Amino acid sequence: MRPTAKEFWDRRAAVYDADAGVFYREAYEKTTACMRKYLKPTDTVLDFACGTGIVTLSLSPDVKALRGIDISDEMIRRAQGKAAAQGIANVLLTQTDLFDASLAPASFDAVLACNVLLYVERRAEVLARISEILRPRGMFLSATDCLGVGMTRERMRKWFEYRTGKRPFVAFDTRETLAQDILR
């Protein structure tokens, strides 16, 4: 039986940082360096699907306040542990989803979505919600794997896990199909 997204990410939390260090360390470094250019010290930012806080905690010194949310209790628990160990005070990490009523309309200067849009089945609803919670002239910053381009070992593994029911929804977008969804 296919796991729910929450079940899948709760299980992955234990190995996520180790895997990210092997497969994605350079990508995370490039992503945070690029995002940092767009953020201001006065910004209030939401990191949607923050996972273990890799991006959230890295960008926290660059903004006024950063809220990280994730559906996985285990991911949030690990992110909270890292934030406490690093003495980071301007970050609030909570287990919830993007449709939580506490995420008020027009309440964020920026919304970050790192490596999550490929796992969002109801993408139009999610993008509409992001637009709703952004302040006027707010920014949506995303870095998303486009699995529909090329076939690496990692992409083949994700495809196989999805097709065999071991992984929840995963999209195999190209840059063009992802951009079309975002710009609608």
Feature roles, as predicted:
Residues 115-116:
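Short catalytic micro-motifs in class I SAM-dependent methyltransferases
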Residues 40, 120-121, 134-135:
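Helix-to-beta-strand junctions that scaffold the AdoMet/dcAdoMet cofactor pocket
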Residues 46-48, 52-100:
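Class I SAM-dependent methyltransferase SAM/SAH-binding core
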